[in-house]
């Protein structure tokens, strides 16, 4: 009887892996969701020129072919993200914000950028273009804030300097192939 314990455990584990693989393809899920530490943003409220108190924590969704990455809440809805084929251009507003934030006399600034919609509205696979809007501004408390609006009908998300640095750290690791977050799906 004791000789059957190990084979039974291995059989159960193999079955779990097969069930997970079956679920992935049966639901046509062509991505995986990973936990990423310290990725957050606030809901920006333009009428108050500030963020809400609550922070929204993000995980990342990465396509199976590693061509796209998006910030997601939990395992579901994609908020905004990046594509490998246009990574340098798409991350430039984030890098420029960090330079802008170092100048205490910097004036508010707005940048608009056409990008693939594949990271907006919950899907990674739409390839129509939408206009992302990046606002560099100071809050009422004079804190530099990057406000990202990934679509004209989307909410705006505010990121502090530290949050932008954390976001770039994760995005750069993904682009370099060294991202190692815990897999959630």
Where are these regions (language model features)?
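Sec-dependent bacterial lipoprotein signal peptides
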Residues: 1-18
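Positively charged, low-complexity terminal tracts
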Residues: 16-185
């Amino acid at each position: 009887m004791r000789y059957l314990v190990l084979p039974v455990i291995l059989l159960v584990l193999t079955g779990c892996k097969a069930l997970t693989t079956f679920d992935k393809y049966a639901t046509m899920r062509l991505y995986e969701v990973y936990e990423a530490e310290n990725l957050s943003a606030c809901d920006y409220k333009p009428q108050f020129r500030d963020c809400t108190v609550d922070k929204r924590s993000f995980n990342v969704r990465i396509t199976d072919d590693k061509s796209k990455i998006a910030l997601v809440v939990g395992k579901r809805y994609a908020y905004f993200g990046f594509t490998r084929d246009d990574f340098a251009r798409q991350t430039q507003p984030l890098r420029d914000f960090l330079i802008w934030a170092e100048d205490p006399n910097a004036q508010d600034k707005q940048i608009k950028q056409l990008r693939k919609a594949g990271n907006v509205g919950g899907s990674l696979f739409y390839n129509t273009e939408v206009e992302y809007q990046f606002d560099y501004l100071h809050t009422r408390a004079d804190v530099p804030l990057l406000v990202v609006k990934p679509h004209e009908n989307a909410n705006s998300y505010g990121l502090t300097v530290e949050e932008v640095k954390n976001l770039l750290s994760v995005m750069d690791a993904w682009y370099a192939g060294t991202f190692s977050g815990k897999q959630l799906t």
